Amino acid sequence: SLGQPFAGVYSTYLIPNNHPDFERRVEDLENAVRLVWSSIYTDSSKAYFNAIDSMIEEEKMAVIIQEVIGNEYNGKYYPNISGVAQSFNFYPFSYIKPEDGFAVIALGLGAYVVGGEKTHRFCPRYPKLQLASIQDMARDSQKHFYAIDMTYSEYNLVPDGEQATIKSYDLKTIEQDGNLQHCASIFDYMNDRIGFDFSVRGPRSVNFPDILQYDYIPLASSLDILLNIFSQAMGAPVEMEFAVNRENDEWIFYLLQIKPLIKNDYHMDIDNENIDFDKAILRADKGMGNGRL
């Protein structure tokens, strides 16, 4: 929608497509399409339509079928990295400008990212610039990830919903799959520092050091270029969802979705000379955000 964002309003179903009975696999796909289409009538969707003063009867929705990016590891299917990037950043810091954008990435399926869980945030133009301290990175790091459970084929999408085929796993599992290297570092409590020797015991901090600090793969520069191209093409700030997957020792970037970022601009002229600041409830010489309280 060009008028209002609808991301996350409707349902998304991921199916393993591995049942031995082909007819059952077709049935699962048909049920998933029906459930996505009917999700427009859920209480949460109706509440969103009421909030934006829109009518469900006027909605024209298409159901999209996409292949899930990833590989199978020991009965689990997931991509190495999932993320969301925006070309406008409402909360810049240091010398980062709002127009430099930002990205959030995590291990495993993108449901972890769009669900608002603990992700790693960075600016694609300045990926080495970090606001968090070493202790903050260890505390606020990703602790689990999502993958499609390929070992269970007798799921039921109707009663179990979007989580019918998705399971949460801890970081030890993804490390055993061989997919934590280049994506995490080890917090050394004794010396209060970050290390990269995975044979050392200690909490894993998912901060993608090799990728963002040492450009193991050009993820940050690729995002910076794409955000600039897409925002110019659309004539507005954009948001995109993406995945990065390692296939035969090659890292491949997948663009999953792109849409305009709805940003309302408010302009107000303020006469500072006639304002009694002694009576002001709140005053800030420097502020950031979307400009509204």
Regions found by a protein language model. Give the residues of each.
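Conserved mixed alpha/beta core segments that line enzyme active sites in large multi-domain catalysts
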Residues: 1-293
